[in-house]
């Protein structure tokens, strides 16, 4: 082997050892957390106000009941997101549908269904 090849290989080995050594040093925690009892709270003693449904259909119905009935105010970010995904739809129609639905998801469903073309 050539002298420069040996120097290159030794340099690479040294860099590898240096990297492994410093990566291992960063993973050592500087502080240790002592085991402690959690403080009692009122929230842990109260039963949940609404039990978690077990069937997937009930979970979906619960999420739909709580999440999709609310309408959000239309802002420029919502319009920009819809326009990015569907640039062929006029912006006025997007804004109007966002005002009606209050949801990017519902507006996209309307676009896919062809209601805004």
Curated annotation (Swiss-Prot):
Also noted in the record is: Present with 1850 molecules/cell in log phase SD medium.
Return the protein name. Answer: CUE domain-containing protein CUE4
What organism is recorded for this protein?
Answer: Saccharomyces cerevisiae (strain ATCC 204508 / S288c)
Q: Which superkingdom, per the lineage?
A: Eukaryota
Gene assigned in the entry: CUE4
| Short name of any one Pfam family annotated for the protein | CUE
Q: Does the keyword DNA repair apply?
A: no
Phosphoserine modification, residue list: 48
* Localization, UniProt: Cytoplasm; Endoplasmic reticulum
Q: Which keywords, in A-to-Z order, does the entry hold?
A: Cytoplasm, Endoplasmic reticulum, Isopeptide bond, Phosphoprotein, Ubl conjugation
Q: Enumerate composition-biased segments (Basic and acidic residues).
A: 56-74
Gene3D superfamilies in the cross-refs: DNA helicase RuvA subunit, C-terminal domain (1.10.8.10)
